[in-house]
Amino acid sequence: MNKEKHFFRRAGAVVFWLAVWQCAAMAIGQEVFLVSPVQALRTLLGLVPRADFWQRAGFSSGRILLGFALGVAVSTVLAALAESCPAADTLLAPVMQLVKATPVASFIILALVWVRGVSLSVLISFLMVLPVLYGAVRTGIRSVDPQLREMAQVFRLPLSRRLRAVWLPAVLPAFRQGCSVALGICWKSGVAAEVIGLPNGSIGDALYRAKITLSTGELFAWTFVIILLSAGFEKLFLALLDRLSRAVLGEVPQC
């Protein structure tokens, strides 16, 4: 019953803001400035049957998710290293702070000096994910019960048993929450990199073309696509992570 109430409340909120959008579009009366949600949906449905739509979606998804995967792997290794070695913690702290504080646009422009536009979204997605998951994994490691760690050392448990009994139950909840945040960030930053780098056949390139041709309907349609891809991949990844957690630990990590 509570789930149904929550669903209807959220659906009602969505309908309310769509109505506000529709009224604003009708009041302005100029599609160049603001298209209605109905027109944006029509434009999106017109894009879907086209082959280049799927090519662009696949091109951008592949590179952004590659950047995310690299961020997951590198941040996990660096977080474990920083927690086990004070010298590594000292060396990595200013780097992570720098990455967090530097604007995405600055990274994109600087990165264009070293990498081609086709690889730019991979690098930028990786850089934006890195400090988020680095902090999340470190938070999880620090939450491990010291008594459990001591017990594992006393009984000389093998590494596989330590991971399942001590480390993963503590790290996975923080890691899951970090991934939820990082996936949204990497999509926004990755598409921003494509808009500036303009690799052919990308979603960012389509957004830029829609902007310079004043095709506001396409601009909103591609924005819908980005939102749907981001939300869809986030739900899929978290579902796979929960399934893996059940297989390894017998339970889903509680965030």
Indicate where each model-derived feature is located:
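Short cytoplasmic-facing helical segments at TM-TM junctions of multi-pass membrane proteins
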Residues: 136-175, 207
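Transmembrane-helix boundary motif in ABC transporter permease subunits
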Residues: 66-96, 109
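Non-cytoplasmic
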Residues: 178-228
